[in-house]
Structures are given as C-alpha cells and as structure tokens.
Amino acid sequence: MEARAGLAMQSRAAVGVGAGPGVGRRGRAVIRVGKRPTAASLRVGGPAGPAAAKPLAPLYCLKASRGHDSLHNSVDEALLLKRKSEEVLFYLNGRCIYLVGMMGSGKSTVAKILAEVLGYSFFDSDKLVEQAVGMPSVAQIFKEHSEAFFRDNESSVLRDLSSMRRLVVATGGGAVIRPVNWKYMKKGLSVWLDVPLDALARRIAQVGTASRPLLDQPSSDPYTAAFSKLSMLAEQRGDAYANADARVSLEEIAAKQGHDDVSKLTPTDIAIEALLKIENFVTEHSTSSGPVGDLIVDSQNRRTKAL
C-alpha cells in the first residue's frame, strides 16, 4: 500500500553563530504515515526579511589564485558566496530551489550551503521518503517493495514540499523521470548539477554502492561497473535533466579556474556558480509572463518602494 507523506514544519529559535539574518534556527519536519509519525530534527538557516533581501552592488572581483594561501582563498569564497546570495535572495521572493542531477553529483552538500547562505530550510527528498515509509534506506525500500513504490512516495514528498516556501531541496537522482515531479518543481526554480560521468564513477567507486540500489551489483572492478551503469542512466535521463531552469556544469567551472579535474573544485565553488546561474535565469526572464516574470515584477516593485 502506498504510503502518503504529509509534511509539517515547526521552527524554534536556537543558538546560532553571529547575529542578524544569518543566525541559525532549528526546524522539525514531521512525516506521518498512517497513524505513526516520525520526527526528524533538521538544520535550517535563519530568516531573511526585506532588509536582508535588498541586493548589494554587483560584485565583479575574482577569487584569489590557487597559489595564494588557502585561508585567503576560503575567505574570498565565503565573501563572494555571501554577496551573491544577497543579490539572488532579493529576486527569489521565497520561491523554493530544487537541485537535480545524477547520484553522487553533490546535490545534498551544495543544497546545504545554499540553504545556509539564503536563510532557507534544507530538505533531502530521499531522506523524507525513508522517514515516510519507516525504512532506514532507499536501498531497503527498493529491496522490500519496488522502485515504483519508492517513486510513488517520492512524488508525494515533492508534492507536499511544493506547497511550502523558502526551501532548498536535494532531489533523488531519478526524480526527473516523472513528469508530475516537474509540475511540482516548476513552482520553484530547478538547478541541474552536471558532473562528468568519469568523476561520478570515481566518487561512487570510492564510497561503495551499497546505498545506491540501481548501482549495487557484484563486480571485481567497482569503477568500471559504476561507469557502465551511470552511462546507461545518463542516456535515459539526460533530456529530463535538461528541463531544469539552470545548468551548473562542473567542467565549465573547472575550465574557468584553470583545473583539468573537477575533483579540485570545492562545494563552495559549485554553490557560487549555482547562485550565478539562478541570477542569470531570473534576470533573463524578468520581462516574461508567468510565475517567473511575475516574481521579478513583484521584486522590482518592492525594491522601488524600498528606495
């Protein structure tokens, strides 16, 4: 029997680092299946009111070269991330952000960074499905039920999340294959993390495939097995990922920074690029009709009143 997931969030103040819009909060998401609720404590960002949403002047500085002190680079990255998040936040108007991409592409890691700097809440749709059906892993859900059962519950979770605001959601790798899921995600902004298959296969081979049911198969060469299966999945899902509002290519980021390997990129590098792509998307659609165009017009009206 399909489990139906209902989401309810209750926030309460907690001790954070610093003060003002960046102060952290603790949130609680309650997933109810039938009559048995399961509670999970989630780390979320702090609120961002009109003052926090007002963008700063565009930032055109470049990060320090990789030859400089690593601490200097970290400070540069943090400042750029903060400045860019404040610019993007002004135009989001509370709309959710959905990260899509292949398994192992870093969606959860990048989503947490984006949620922190935007003052949004973070959710992992796979974790919510696990809580909804009362099982510890996606692999076990596939084993004891089926992929179709998992996909049904995944759609239910995305449906419930789509009714909320100010979320960054890391979706499962296969969430894009169902058109109804795009209906839910299009209520917000979707970002595709496009990672080369070779890099994905190396990552997955290092950590193992036990938690990834579509890849878990006996093999004397984990890399070859992972690359083969990932290639097949990419062929099946490539067009679906391209439906995203913005594409973040790790190869392009690496090339701009002079790297020959995407593994040299930091999650912050990727998060900054995601914010740039989101900003490009919303500004390019500022004159269009529909939800995104209405979003920009409303943001521009609020900015005019604030001046």
From Swiss-Prot:
GO terms for cellular component: chloroplast; plastid. It is found in: Plastid, Chloroplast. Disulfide bonds: none annotated. Keywords: Amino-acid biosynthesis, Aromatic amino acid biosynthesis, ATP-binding, Chloroplast, Kinase, Magnesium, Metal-binding, Nucleotide-binding, Plastid, Transferase, Transit peptide. Substrate binds at residues 126, 151, 173. Mg(2+) binds at residue 108. Its cofactor is Mg(2+). ATP binds at residues 101-108, 212. It catalyses: shikimate + ATP = 3-phosphoshikimate + ADP + H(+). Pathway: Metabolic intermediate biosynthesis; chorismate biosynthesis; chorismate from D-erythrose 4-phosphate and phosphoenolpyruvate: step 5/7. CDD domains: SK (cd00464). Coiled coil: none annotated. Its EC number is 2.7.1.71. Binds 1 Mg(2+) ion per subunit. Pfam families: SKI (PF01202). Residues 285-307 are annotated as: Disordered. Expressed in panicles. Induction: By chitin oligosaccharide elicitor. GO terms for biological process: amino acid biosynthetic process; aromatic amino acid family biosynthetic process; chorismate biosynthetic process; shikimate metabolic process. GO terms for molecular function: ATP binding; metal ion binding; shikimate kinase activity. Residues 1-60 form a transit peptide. Belongs to the shikimate kinase family. Catalyzes the specific phosphorylation of the 3-hydroxyl group of shikimic acid using ATP as a cosubstrate. This is Shikimate kinase 2, chloroplastic. It comes from Oryza sativa subsp. japonica (Rice). The gene is SK2.
